[in-house]
């Protein structure tokens, strides 16, 4: 956004745009204390917490004087300041160099000063002092605020130089944010301002001005605030409530731990209750992750929310955690698809110099955004650090709560114990769906699997494209992550590892072991999954003599071959005999080769986008299939090419197998389709001697163009077939001396370059293990943050919203002292901090750290309200 142009005249900052100085040249600190901060003397003994609204942050002297007053006190200050053209950090540093008496507080402000990007910026400068800087037009920002101010500082440039800031319209918006009796302080004695304040419900007095100024205005709010239009999202009025002293957090993930940290910092006695044997064992338990925002088009609310959450998270983690937990090395977001590129272009026009990220359109392999405060994060370590010293109850499964007389909450647990607390915060992440089953809230649990590999990508900072890659930590590099909505499978799957590798294929490099290869074509390479993979932490997958991986040590000879197939000379062998690729390509019957059936194409498209067909071939007989004891789960199959005339017999016999329904085969033809993926519960039974090979999802090559003398393929010399089944090199290539060849990715890695290089000698990636976790996702991609609403009241009071949404409605009703905070999805490290901060804002009746329009997007009742507005119940 546009920053202020500051010219220094005799050491005093001057604005050429408004032709005015930023503060009194004679005694700026004295003026600030006399005109503005003296208001605290009038109300100091009446309150323990003060909310201040300022129009015109300028050089920040009013705030710094207030900060200095509160810093070592037992009072709390929540200061909100609006600025349309903020001064840069460098210019502020020049200004503060002349105020040695403010050095202790100005240094803290400079350290936390945000990038100059439109929106709200919450700075927690001390346990009892928050500053919310709101960059934007004063009238627009006032509409986005939601709190009751005890004092208002009107300190813009002179009314004659900046009329819009002192208008009656602005005064009316200020009045709607004032508590009854709130004071308005200003150096101005303008007659127009006096009338504007009076017309807005203020009682106005003239007082002696400071220094050479004869008079100044002081006003008190004596009117009534207008109810907001969408009253169903209004905040709870805590008038008369006793300040809480204790809090119980349900959930030991990042959302719960950060919330516990912040509530303890406010002086509450905090307890965490976690159902598992330790904290951070679910979605917050990854070895490594990325702290970065979701970049959408600038005006999209989802992106605005994520930008706010990211900036808060970067400040919080930077202030409170160490290098062992998080390393601010920057992060890169690649525009691997057109819609991301379009977002970057729009940001370039809107606010390219935003201070959060730098756009680069000429880079390889894609255009990118480098996020300056992006970080390599250690989520589990972060949870441990944030919860250090906080009482934590493990193996403590929450079952429900009841409200007690006086507003306290009693939580009940599966083992029969109960815990009472003044505040209950539900931070259960992926289990929110079950917890809020009785509420009109659209939630789902998403299974995500990350893959741990030996270091393979040379990078000192994390990055994200279709997948993401973290720098190696402790000899382990994390890539990820899969996304399976409402799939509950704790065991890692090799097919997910393959997908993770395929999603970052264009970035893979290095010299790796020969046992496990990856398709570098840049396309999906989903493979057959045979039974459970087993616990990935026991990196003891059985290797076979042909380089494949046995996924289940209890299943002899049932194998998955990673990667994809090339020509028949280098196909992985069945009993030392190669598969006849020519017959596969031509659709002819190949001896002892059968085809397994398919999952619903539409579901695949929804989950993965458009993917190429996948072919599975295996050597077995229908009799063995029908009599087998070993399950086969088939997923990620889109279309298959029938390669054996005996498929009808196979399907017929397979239908007799225990646990498999022949009706799953809806037709037996050259293209056999299933209505849904098979899994372990309705799987085909395959014999012990069955061996499998996945052809991957690359492009099937015309065997007539294969160079049968070569040990590797050159795709540029091959004619593409119309059936679009792309087969790449699977088996090991060796040099003349018999040693395995290695592969180094070029510095200028593009999908095309990598494809060509990969078909010469694809690299080997050694998978160390995998980690499965579950995350919470809402139906609209916003997290659930806020006070738990009274479902019955909403359905009754707002049942006629279809007709009355523009008429007066009753104020909402909430469940006393129960809050929710979900660390949402892949940006959970960011939204966890946003959630914790908002919960504190609501508990302590502070100004919100985010725009009101964005807070409404997080409200737990939003899904119900949308239904009621449509006349639904």
Residue ranges and their predicted role:
Residues 288-366, 766, 775:
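Dinucleotide-binding Rossmann-like beta1-alpha1 core, especially the glycine-rich loop
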Residues 394-409:
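A conserved short coil-to-beta-strand element within the FAD-binding core of flavoproteins
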Residues 245-271:
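N-terminal Rossmann-like FAD-binding beta1-loop-alpha1 element of flavoenzymes
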Residues 103-106, 297-300, 323-333, 356-387, ...:
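Helix-loop-beta segment of a Rossmann-like dinucleotide-binding subdomain
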Residues 266-284:
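Glycine-rich FAD pyrophosphate-binding loop
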Residues 514-518, 763-873:
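C-terminal catalytic lobe of FAD-dependent flavoproteins
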Residues 280, 418-464, 493, 510, ...:
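Central helical "cap/lid" subdomain
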Residues 488-519, 643, 722, 743-774, ...:
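Flavin-binding catalytic cores
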């Amino acid at each position: 956004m546009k920053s202020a142009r500051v010219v220094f005249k005799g050491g005093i900052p001057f604005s050429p745009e408004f032709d005015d100085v930023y503060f009194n040249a004679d005694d700026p600190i004295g003026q600030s204390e006399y005109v503005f901060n003296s208001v605290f003397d009038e109300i100091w003994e009446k309150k323990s917490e003060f909310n201040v609204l300022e129009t015109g942050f300028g050089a920040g002297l009013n705030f710094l004087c207030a900060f200095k007053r509160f810093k070592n006190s037992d009072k709390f200050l929540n200061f909100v300041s609006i600025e349309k053209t903020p001064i840069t950090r460098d210019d502020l540093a020049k200004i503060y160099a002349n105020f040695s008496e403010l050095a202790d507080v100005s240094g803290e402000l400079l350290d936390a000063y945000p990038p100059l990007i439109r929106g709200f910026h919450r700075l927690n400068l001390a346990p009892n002092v928050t500053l919310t800087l709101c960059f934007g037009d004063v009238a627009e920002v006032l509409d986005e605020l939601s709190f009751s101010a005890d004092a208002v500082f009107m300190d813009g440039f002179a009314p004659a130089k900046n009329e819009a800031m002192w208008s009656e319209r602005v005064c009316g918006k200020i009045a709607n944010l004032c508590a009854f009796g709130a004071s308005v302080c200003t150096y101005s004695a303008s007659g127009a301002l006096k009338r504007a304040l009076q017309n807005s419900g203020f009682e106005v007095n003239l007082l002696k001005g400071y220094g050479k100024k004869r008079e100044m205005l002081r006003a008190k709010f004596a009117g009534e605030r207008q109810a907001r239009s969408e009253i169903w999202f209004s905040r709870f009025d805590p008038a008369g409530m006793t300040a809480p002293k204790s809090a119980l957090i349900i959930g030991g993930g990042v959302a719960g731990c950060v919330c516990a940290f912040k509530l303890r910092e406010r002086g509450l006695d905090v307890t965490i209750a976690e159902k598992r044997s330790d904290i951070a064992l679910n979605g917050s338990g990854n070895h490594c992750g990325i702290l970065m925002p979701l970049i959408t088009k600038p005006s999209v609310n989802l992106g605005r929310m994520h930008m706010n959450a990211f900036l808060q998270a970067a400040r919080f983690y930077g202030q409170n955690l160490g290098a062992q937990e998080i390393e601010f090395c920057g992060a890169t977001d690649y525009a691997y698809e057109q819609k991301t590129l379009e977002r970057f272009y729009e940001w370039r026009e809107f606010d390219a110099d935003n201070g959060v990220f730098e756009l680069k359109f000429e880079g390889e392999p894609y255009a990118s955004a480098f996020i300056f405060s992006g970080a390599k994060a250690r989520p589990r370590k972060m949870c441990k650090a944030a919860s250090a010293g906080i009482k934590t109850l493990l193996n403590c499964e929450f079952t429900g709560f009841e409200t007690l007389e006086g507003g306290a909450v009693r939580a009940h647990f599966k083992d029969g114990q109960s815990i009472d607390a003044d505040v209950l915060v539900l931070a259960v992440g992926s289990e929110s769906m079950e917890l809020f089953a009785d509420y009109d809230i659209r939630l789902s649990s998403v299974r995500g699997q990350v893959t741990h590999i030996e270091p393979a990508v040379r990078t000192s900072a994390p990055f994200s494209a279709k997948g993401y890659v973290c720098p190696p930590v402790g000899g382990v590099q994390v890539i990820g992550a899969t996304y399976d909505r409402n799939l509950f499978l704790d065991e890692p799957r090799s097919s997910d590892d393959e997908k993770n590798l395929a999603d970052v294929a264009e970035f893979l490099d290095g010299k790796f072991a020969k046992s496990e290869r990856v398709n570098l074509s840049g396309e999906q390479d989903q493979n057959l999954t045979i039974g459970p993979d087993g616990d990935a932490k026991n990196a003891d997958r059985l290797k076979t003599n042909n380089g494949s991986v046995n996924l289940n040590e209890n299943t002899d000879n049932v194998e998955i071959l990673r990667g994809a197939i090339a020509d028949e000379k280098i196909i992985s062998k069945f009993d030392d005999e190669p598969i006849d690729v020519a017959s596969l390509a031509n659709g002819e019957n190949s001896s002892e080769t059968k085809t397994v059936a398919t999952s619903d194409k539409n579901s695949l498209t929804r989950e993965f986008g458009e993917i190429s067909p996948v072919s599975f071939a295996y050597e077995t007989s229908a009799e063995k299939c029908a009599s087998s004891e070993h399950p086969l789960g088939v997923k990620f199959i889109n279309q298959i090419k029938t390669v054996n005339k005996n498929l009808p017999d196979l399907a017929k016999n397979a239908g007799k197998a225990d646990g498999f329904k022949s009706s799953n085969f809806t037709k037996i033809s050259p293209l056999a389709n299933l209505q849904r993926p098979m899994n372990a519960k309705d799987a085909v039974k395959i014999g012990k001697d069955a061996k499998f090979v996945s052809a991957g999802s690359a492009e099937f090559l015309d065997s007539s163009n294969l160079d049968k003398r070569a040990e590797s393929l050159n795709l540029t010399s091959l004619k593409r077939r119309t059936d679009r089944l792309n087969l790449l090199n699977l088996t090991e290539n060796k040099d003349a001396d018999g040693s395995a060849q290695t592969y180094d990715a070029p510095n200028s890695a593009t999908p095309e370059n990598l494809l060509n290089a990969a078909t010469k000698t694809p690299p080997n990636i050694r998978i160390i293990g995998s980690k499965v976790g579950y995350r919470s996702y809402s139906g609209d991609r916003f997290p659930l943050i806020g006070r738990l609403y009274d479902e019955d009241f909403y359905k009754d009071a707002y049942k006629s919203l279809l007709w009355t949404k523009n008429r007066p409605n009753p104020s909402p009703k909430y469940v006393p002292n129960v809050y929710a905070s979900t660390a949402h999805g892949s940006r959970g490290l960011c939204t966890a901090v946003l959630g914790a901060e908002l919960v504190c804002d609501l508990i302590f009746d502070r100004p919100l750290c985010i725009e009101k329009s964005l807070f409404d997007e997080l409200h737990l009742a939003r899904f119900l309200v949308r239904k009621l507005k449509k006349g639904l119940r």
